From Swiss-Prot:
Presence of the UniProt keyword Ribonucleoprotein in the record: yes
Function: This protein is located at the 30S-50S ribosomal subunit interface and may play a role in the structure and function of the aminoacyl-tRNA binding site.
GO molecular function, one term: structural constituent of ribosome
GO cellular component, one term: cytosolic large ribosomal subunit
Keyword annotations: Ribonucleoprotein, Ribosomal protein
Gene3D superfamilies: 2.30.30.790
One Pfam family of this chain: Ribosomal_L19
Annotated protein name in UniProt: Large ribosomal subunit protein bL19
Annotated organism of origin: Rhodopirellula baltica (strain DSM 10527 / NCIMB 13988 / SH1)
Entry's family note: Belongs to the bacterial ribosomal protein bL19 family.
Length: 117
């Protein structure tokens, strides 16, 4: 009984067209930012290093390097503040979490590109 109710609430809070991307992909995340009474879209570009959760609580982590410093940001997949997620490049990975990229610098951060068939 409770699981059925929880599933209904979970499905009601999910986006119908959730973005499709994998771990290791380089993505542009377009998020809505409110500044006072104005709304604008901010783009965060980086590599998806992990996904966690399920259903409406699913999150993904994007990492990029800014001025020599690593910056990570977590986004909810089904958030209404996420306008869209564009996949720029698909990377080949053999891990579910790419936390080892935190220790790498420069060209070592790059991943091999996945061939598209």
């Amino acid at each position: 009984m409770n699981n059925a109710i929880m599933d209904m609430v979970d499905k009601a809070n999910q986006k119908e067209n959730a973005p499709q991307f994998d771990i290791g992909d380089t993505v542009d995340v377009h998020s809505k930012i409110l500044e006072g009474n104005k709304e604008r879209i901010q783009v965060f570009t980086g590599v998806v290093i992990g996904r966690s959760g399920k259903g409406a609580q699913e999150m993904f982590t994007v990492r990029r390097i800014v001025a020599g410093e690593g910056v990570e940001r977590k986004f909810p997949v089904h958030s209404p503040r996420i306008e869209k997620v564009e996949v720029k490049r698909s990377g080949v990975t053999r891990r579910a979490k790419l936390y080892f990229l935190r220790d790498r610098v420069g060209k070592a951060v790059r991943l091999k590109e996945r061939r598209r068939v």
